[in-house]
From Swiss-Prot:
Name by which UniProt lists this protein: Pectate lyase A
Obligatory cofactor(s): Ca(2+)
Pathway stated in the Swiss-Prot or TrEMBL entry: Glycan metabolism; pectin degradation; 2-dehydro-3-deoxy-D-gluconate from pectin: step 2/5
S-S bridge residues: 329-357
Alphabetized GO MF terms: metal ion binding; pectate lyase activity
Residue sites binding Ca(2+) per the record: 173, 175, 215, 219
Record localization: Secreted
List of catalytic residues: 272
Family: Belongs to the polysaccharide lyase 1 family. PLADES subfamily.
Cofactor note: Binds 1 Ca(2+) ion per subunit.
The keyword Hydrolase is assigned to this record: no
Origin: domain of life: Bacteria
Lineage: Bacteria, Pseudomonadati, Pseudomonadota, Gammaproteobacteria, Enterobacterales
Function text: Involved in maceration and soft-rotting of plant tissue.
Length: 392
């Protein structure tokens, strides 16, 4: 692990950046600059992460708590600074398994779940920062809050020992990212989460049933709050985003789970974009692409409204192949919930009429200032062009 100072850095050329990174990785001495000055940015005002305080991550880090890391050993060492403000810059692929395959459920649980402490910014350098074979966990059990994750690719973990549930088949356990147990003030920006090199058509069968090895992409649950997800790409995944742990978890979740989603792309995701229990979700200017006849990631729905969950959808784009205008209500599914409103969204190039889908209007006030751009083909393409890792 190599520490770098807190002075800002203006990138003048690709060669200069490459030289700096090479020096950090090979010399074993402290470099002179902060490689990615965007690590000093706070969560945008247009989002729940800006409310009831702010989300600054590790922006206040002193020079001895700014790092460049290239592997899991360096990453966990940097995280060991605890709640002190820190900036952890990622270059290349971090294999959370350390190159040693997980033997079984217990081994995967022990080694694959990486807890990100309070006052931390994790940010990728350049275009190839990546996490594989594990999960980033933002767990509020010990008071964790004020975390920023930016410009990284997360390949969803593969459960090496799924559990079997009678009537439901094989179920996997691990998510790409999990915000849980009261964690609050979290900003996820320019992140890509995808099944990557192991897609669902590669599942085998066991005891006559599909051996499912993926769980969620990004889950937010158990009383977590004040989260903004922006400019991110969710690609090729089934159960994408669960907000709210269960129908019976009202004691922990009620009045929490305020989440904003904007300028994100949900591409070839089957469902849960998101599925909501108890949470209050604001989704605007996002792009949803799918196909109800996709042979691998068959589109089921985007918004799932569960127990006491509510969603305000504004200016979103739905391009769903083989879905007619008369079936527009397929984009929002009722799971014991009743509150959903949409304004200005587009389905397959025409205004989406979601007013007759059987929901009550979303009436809660949005406390922050935001601007919904009218959804056009050009805007949808621009959002797509700028979403995900490597686009910061």
């Amino acid at each position: 692990m190599n520490k770098v100072s807190g002075r800002s850095f203006t990138r003048t050329s690709t060669c200069l950046l490459a030289t700096l990174i090479a020096g950090v990785m090979t010399s074993g001495v402290s470099a002179a600059e902060l490689v990615n000055s965007k690590a000093l940015e706070s969560a945008p005002a247009a989002g729940w992460a800006s409310q009831n305080g702010s989300t600054t991550g590790g922006a206040a880090a002193t020079s001895d708590n700014i790092y460049v890391v290239t592997n899991i050993s360096e990453f966990t060492s940097a995280l060991s600074a605890g709640a002190v403000a820190k900036i952890i810059q990622i270059t290349g692929t971090v294999d959370i398994s350390g190159g040693t395959p997980y033997k079984d459920f217990a081994d995967q649980k022990a080694r694959s779940q990486i807890n990100i402490p309070a006052n931390t910014t994790v940010i990728g350098i350049g275009t190839d920062a990546k996490f594989i074979n594990g999960s980033l966990i933002i767990d509020g059990t010990d008071g964790t809050n004020n975390v920023i994750i930016r410009n990284v690719y997360i390949q969803t973990p593969i459960d090496v020992e799924p559990h079997y549930e009678k009537g439901d088949g094989w179920n996997a356990e691990w998510d790409g990212m999990n915000i849980t147990n009261g964690a609050h003030h979290v900003w996820v920006d320019h992140v890509t989460i995808s099944d990557g090199s192991f897609t669902d058509d590669m599942y085998t069968t066991k005891d006559g049933e599909t051996y499912v090895q993926h769980d969620g992409a990004l889950d937010i649950k158990r009383g977590s709050d004040y989260v903004t997800i922006s400019n991110s790409l969710f690609d090729q995944h089934d159960k994408t985003m669960l907000i709210g742990h269960s129908d019976t978890n009202s004691a922990q979740d009620k009045g929490k789970l305020h989440v904003t989603l904007f300028n994100n792309v949900f591409n070839r995701v089957t469902e849960r974009a998101p599925r909501v229990r108890y949470g209050s979700i604001h989704s605007f200017n996002n792009v949803f692409n799918g196909d109800v006849k996709d042979p691998v990631y068959r589109y089921l729905y985007s918004f799932g409204i569960g127990t006491s969950g509510s969603v305000l959808s504004e200016g979103n784009s739905f391009t769903i192949a083989n879905l007619s205008a008369s079936k527009a209500c397929k984009v929002v599914k009722k799971f014991n919930g009743s509150i959903f409103s949409d304004n200005g969204s587009v389905l397959n190039g025409s205004a989406a009429d979601l007013s007759g889908c059987g929901f009550s209007a979303y009436t809660s006030a949005i406390p922050y200032v935001y601007a919904v751009q009218p959804m056009t083909t050009e805007l949808a393409q621009s959002i797509t062009d700028h979403a995900g890792s490597g686009k910061l």
